[in-house]
């Protein structure tokens, strides 16, 4: 994958527009989870060190396009950046007709989705973005699967279009995990439905040695293998699909599970062998025997790709399976890459972030890359690099 990289460019005195993914949760006007902002800081700092006049842009939430809404304003993010960078980071609301930024200074543009034509990737808007800068830097992997004005359109028209360090690192890590993975490769794909992860499961079944499934997905595979799953969430119309995937790759199934009579924080957890699951049981986690077996598979892997917790880890009594696997991934010598919102929450809960080789900041983009789909915002950078 050949793209121009920001790290290789001379930015001294240049006007640099950086598209970051600063779409963070905000509560009562304050940023409540700062992971994405923290991930963007090295890129912003590097551009400043290189002597650029830095303009940062992002979306936040889902406002009605073309209309200002206070709840989707990037003001809390500007406040956070000011503290984190130890300098004033003004929020600029009107910037499309030009903005005055000096070399060595940084400003944050107001939510790009307040601009008409952003989501439709309108050329007229993209050209206005491009006219603001000498260099456009795409650093938002989390939005790379969307062709929008500030992710794709601007890259078509900017004088120079490059990948930022965060985007370049994501592409490198995913390329390493999927392109030529160290063997054996184990993937964990968990979630409520096979249907939403079908392309991921099909894609991974062609490259990994073991495919560990969890959550409602595992229940569908269990039912496909003839096991009773009680009143657990599963998809009866996808049993043949599950069997077809299991015929292509080793899918180790749980031998014991943690069940409850209801889906609730107060529910009583009971460990049962898979053969003992009753008609009124709900499977909400893998059992200790299964977790220990899966942990051994992970510890002896060369590459691990993790997407999704294997149980309802938000309730502690159904979190032991995910905790055991998270710790095993952390202890493994494998190159490990993890992505997806719930996965990141599990990594935080069990404190294994430092032990995972690469944590992807993109949810949808991570999955689409794993599926083998083209990411429009990356494709345009490749095209510009060739030109």
UniProtKB/Swiss-Prot annotation:
Signal peptide location: none
Pfam families: PGK
UniProt binding sites for substrate: 21-23, 36, 59-62, 113, 146
Subcellular location: Cytoplasm
Pathway: Carbohydrate degradation; glycolysis; pyruvate from D-glyceraldehyde 3-phosphate: step 2/5
Record's keyword terms, sorted: ATP-binding, Cytoplasm, Glycolysis, Kinase, Nucleotide-binding, Transferase
InterPro entries associated with the record: Phosphoglycerate_kinase, Phosphoglycerate_kinase_CS, Phosphoglycerate_kinase_N, Phosphoglycerate_kinase_sf
Reaction catalysed by this enzyme: (2R)-3-phosphoglycerate + ATP = (2R)-3-phospho-glyceroyl phosphate + ADP
MF-aspect GO terms: ADP binding; ATP binding; phosphoglycerate kinase activity
Assigned GO CC terms: cytosol
GO biological process annotation, one example: gluconeogenesis
Residues involved in ATP binding: 197, 314, 340-343
EC number(s) given by UniProt: 2.7.2.3
Coiled-coil segments on the chain, per record: none
UniProt record similarity statement: Belongs to the phosphoglycerate kinase family.
Record note on quaternary structure: Monomer.
UniProt name for this protein: Phosphoglycerate kinase
Lineage: Bacteria, Pseudomonadati, Pseudomonadota, Gammaproteobacteria, Pseudomonadales
